[in-house]
Amino acid sequence: MRPFAIAFVGLVLAQPGNVLNGNWTANFQGTTYVRLAFADGATAPQGTMSIGQSIHVDVEGNVDNATAASSTPTRMLDTRWNDGVLSFGINDGPDVDRFEFRLIDANHAELAMILSEEERRQAAAAQMPLPKPFRLTKTP
């Protein structure tokens, strides 16, 4: 019975949601502009996200100005864990914004905005640089 119990504990700890569980933030000059919170779901991690209304990046795609994340988080939609990447959507009015969350290590991750080809074309036409993934840190 003991080998079974040890194997079960190993299986539970290997589930992706357990590594993600908790709060993750991205900060710029003391301002938290992205906040995510994860918990285990039945088939995939579940969570909420809040993000600042304005995030500006320099020509290289690095954040150089950001407003604080909303104090009211939005529930993640359509969460999918695939090959070490959690993809999800956030309802933004009539649109759903897509993101990918990728762990770097137990306390650091990257959050990338997933833009459609049309959004990429519009940004290029307006000579707007695309943002690099936001660097997140797990907070206690």
Regions found by a protein language model. Name each.
Residues D105-N107:
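Residue-level recognition of beta-strand termini and adjacent short loop/turns
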Residues P3-V12:
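Sec-dependent N-terminal signal peptides
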Residues F101-R102:
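Exposed beta-sheet edge/beta-hairpin loop segments within beta-rich domains
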Residues T139-P140:
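Short, solvent-exposed mixed-charge patches
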Residues G17-R98, Q122-R135:
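Central antiparallel beta-sheet cores of small beta-barrel/beta-sandwich binding domains
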